[in-house]
A protein has these predicted regions:
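Acidic, low-complexity central loop/insert segments
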Residues: 105-150
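Acidic, proline/glycine-enriched N-terminal capping motif
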Residues: 1-97, 102
């Protein structure tokens, strides 16, 4: 049995109740969300991964959406990899760096449309960083976190 308490600091994915029903015994926090870690029998989990099928709740792999007339400009400012040839529907693995060039995240960026990019982030507050950079540059963009729940097989 897993006891978690509702809070705005740690969210649950749309699959949380199903993972608990399937026997979740341990969890951690990742991207301010519950990340299932164990179902109580590591050997059985290993066999499911190597000999069968395992379904994982990875709703904690969040997106940061950058949308607006300056979305492409902000996306390019955030990462040193050239995105000028990133077509709609195309994704690229990119480092995201701070002002000193230190890598602060390594997401996959997807160009959703001409004025929208999604950064599929690792465990960090990249949305805050992107919002700050957009504000300091006076860019016409909105930085949000779209509600996307994902599960992997």
């Amino acid at each position: 049995m897993v006891d978690t308490y509702p809070t705005t600091r740690v969210r649950r994915s749309p699959f949380y109740e199903a993972t608990v029903a399937d026997g979740l015994t341990a969890a951690t926090t990742y991207n301010h969300m519950v990340l299932p870690m164990s179902y109580g029998d590591p050997e059985a989990e290993y066999r499911r991964l190597t000999e069968g099928v395992s379904m994982w709740d990875v709703g904690c792999q969040r997106q940061v959406e950058v949308r607006g007339p300056d979305a492409a400009r902000l996306a390019q400012i955030l990462c040193p990899r050239h995105l000028t040839h990133c077509a709609v529907g195309q994704g690229k693995y990119v480092p995201v760096c701070n002002h000193r060039g230190t890598v602060i995240n390594d997401p996959v960026v997807l160009r959703v449309d001409e004025e929208c990019f999604w950064f599929s982030i690792a465990d960090s507050d990249m949305g805050l960083w992107a919002s700050c950079v957009a504000a300091e540059r006076g860019l016409d963009v909105q930085v949000t976190e779209p509600e996307i729940g994902r599960a992997h097989v």
